[in-house]
């Protein structure tokens, strides 16, 4: 609903008969800038705006260019929020008085040297924290040191917090206490002390269950994640300039059940405590500055998983740099696997050997598979092939690959979108049904999607 339509409805008195609480909910569903504009219609709407419990403030409509005056560095232009944006935010918060708020989102560009702008941001955050905010999304771009207001790290009501992006935080207070926080998303944050994430921030979150740590093209990548309560973790690092042979990673997370980890392979994994892990998704790449990669301890640390997802890059890394061999995956029943070459299929054979309970195998592509890589005896009952393109070589590969599994009850082949026109897809399906249908056990279902 745009502002003009909303103003038209209001001017016709089409909804003013609704209860104020309902009108407040309606205003919460439209962009904050338009919701604020309704306060100009009549005194009644100024009162109703106080009931809006969801605010999204973004300075993208009001930026000004300033020159970076950092001594010794090449001068370049940065963008920061304008005085008009400051007035708009101050007015918006003032209109609401001290009414409770549930969700607050602030996206702004802060001047590196303007302490007045930094103070404004701190005041805005303290305002909504003082009103009992539940969910807080702060995306602040500040090339200088930015200190979080004390009220933020002592909130009793905050349940979900997002902090970013490319932000250098000043020293955190030692009294961080977020007793209700269950979800934390950190996007490219540099902490004043490298241990502040683990030893100060996470230590002050006694009921935290979900954590996402993303770090892209920036310095000071967090290398230790520890929490006695965490259940879900997503780590996405892409910082080639911040990695070398001394880089390491540590996960001390005894209650973690879900891990998504995207990073380059490192030389050391100091402490991997993931005893409760149920599902893991690994995307491990190569970095030339890491001279001796070894992912053995990481792979041993995830050995209790029931579901494992390996990207093609991860398969290559594990085959080449799990230097002390694969552990036994005693609980593994679901495996999603991608390979780029013959080495990857050899790793699959080793995984089948070490995973005697495996029932479901998802193969992302048959690229590189040859019949001379034989699979050990296994109990796989469900085989799912992704990315089938309908080539003659793939039919041969698929027929050979299926022959390695004697206990199959279901084979499903997904045709890739690249197998362009419908005629080709239909032909591929008919070919597969004819060529493979007769070679499958009678109890096995065969599907092409």
Swiss-Prot record:
Q: Which superkingdom is the protein from?
A: Eukaryota
Annotated F-box domain residues: 12-64
InterPro entries under this entry? F-box-like_dom_sf (IPR036047), F-box_dom (IPR001810), FBL60-like (IPR055294), LRR_dom_sf (IPR032675), LRR_FXL15/At3g58940/PEG3-like (IPR055411)
Keyword hit for Repeat: yes
Q: Where are the LRR repeats?
A: 161-188, 191-215, 216-237, 239-263, 287-312, 340-365
Which residues lie in coiled coils?
A: none
Keywords in UniProt for this one?
Answer: Leucine-rich repeat, Repeat
**Pfam families, A to Z:** F-box, LRR_At5g56370
Identification of the protein by name = F-box/LRR-repeat protein At3g60040
Q: Which organism is it from?
A: Arabidopsis thaliana (Mouse-ear cress)
